[in-house]
């Protein structure tokens, strides 16, 4: 039996990842706002991955509360993520994925391009996402990750500006 994956946040994106982990054979434990993170870490001290998939506005409050037992197992996905977002909390090398697919409520996933991933559990993210037909491209270095995160940020700013014009 495979080690579990803990999901902090189980919205639209979290639900997609949870489905991928389940399809790949990993038990998934969701952690919602009502669940104490320290208690969850005591109950599941050594998960394969702790994937934080919360809304942009909630990311920092979750990272502030993350139990030290999970520091080496953290995975992050966020639209406007940059290294400063995790470095300030002491996470040296989290697993990070820059998501290049859309998921709207009541609609199927729409893949734009393969999502780049880097970090200790990037292969796990690739395995899970590809099990549900979402391509993931593994990166070889932190500098490649930084480049991909900046590209994603530029894309978001550009689409937001374009939306203001129309």
For the regions a language model picked out, list residue spans one by one.
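A structural micro-motif
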Residues: 3, 26, 48, 72-73, ...
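A short, glycine/Asx- and small/polar-enriched loop/turn
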Residues: 45, 150-153
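Active-site-adjacent beta-strand anchor residues
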Residues: 7, 52-53, 144, 148
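N-terminal glycine-rich phosphate-binding loop for ADP-containing cofactors
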Residues: 161-166
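Rossmann-like NAD(P)(H) cofactor-binding subdomain of soluble oxidoreductases
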Residues: 14-22, 34-110
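NAD(P)+-binding Rossmann beta1-loop-alpha1 motif at the extreme N-terminus of oxidoreductases
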Residues: 1-43, 124-131
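Rossmann-fold dinucleotide-binding core
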Residues: 76-151, 158
């Amino acid at each position: 039996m495979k080690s579990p994956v803990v999901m902090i946040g189980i919205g639209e994106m979290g639900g997609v990842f949870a489905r991928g982990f389940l399809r790949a054979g990993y038990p998934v434990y969701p952690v919602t706002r009502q669940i104490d993170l320290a208690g969850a870490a005591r109950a599941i001290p050594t998960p394969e991955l702790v994937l934080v998939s919360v809304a942009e506005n909630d990311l920092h409050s979750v990272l502030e509360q993350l139990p030290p037992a999970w520091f080496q197992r953290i995975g992050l996905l966020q639209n406007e993520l940059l290294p400063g977002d995790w470095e300030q909390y002491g996470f040296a090398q989290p697993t990070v994925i820059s998501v290049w697919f859309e998921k709207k409520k009541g609609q199927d996933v729409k893949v734009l391009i393969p999502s780049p991933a880097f970090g200790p559990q990037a292969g796990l993210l690739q395995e899970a996402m590809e099990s549900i037909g979402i391509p993931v491209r593994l990166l070889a270095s932190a500098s490649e990750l930084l480049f991909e995160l900046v590209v994603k940020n530029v894309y978001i700013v550009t689409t937001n500006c374009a939306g203001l014009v129309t």
